[in-house]
Design a protein with these regions (language model features):
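Catalytic and binding regions of secreted/periplasmic enzymes and modules that target cell-wall glycans
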Residues: 61, 75-127
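N-terminal secretory targeting signals
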Residues: 1-41
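Phosphate-binding glycine-rich loops and adjacent basic patches that engage nucleotide phosphates
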Residues: 12, 21-24, 60-69
Length: 127
């Protein structure tokens, strides 16, 4: 085996190791820069039920204004509860995912779409 071939293999192996280390560092830094919170899971779940991205954006804005996606949120003056801020005491005993389901049903029954509910909220500061 010529000496150049062995050196080439060592050099090639070193480059591959270097690239692998860089990729590993990059993946690690991405993991650390974005850690999932319960709110991220609530939004992901809501987005899975509201497929249209534009409609989800409206819902995200609406419920951020209403409760900041907090399932324990309670508006004492208005008597509204949960992520969707509905006037139903049952919501305070429901998990966040069930609150999202109920809230989406309410939006559909009252406003047909999240964007219609958001437009109403912009005019009246409630939906």
């Amino acid at each position: 085996m010529p000496a150049g071939d062995a050196g080439h293999k060592i050099s090639r192996c070193g480059i591959l190791m270097g690239v692998s280390c860089l990729l590993l560092l990059q993946m690690t830094s991405v993991e650390k820069s974005w850690s999932k919170t319960p709110v991220d899971y609530y939004k992901l779940y809501a987005h899975s039920l509201v497929i249209d991205f534009k409609e989800f954006q409206c819902l995200e804005k609406l419920w951020t204004k209403e409760s900041n996606w907090n399932p324990a949120s309670h508006n004492k003056s208005g008597g509204a509860f949960g992520i969707p801020q509905m006037k139903n005491k049952k919501l305070k005993n429901m998990d966040a995912f069930t609150q999202i389901q109920w809230g989406l049903r309410y939006v559909k029954d009252r406003d047909q779409t999240p964007c219609n509910a958001w437009a109403y909220w912009l005019k009246h500061k409630h939906y």
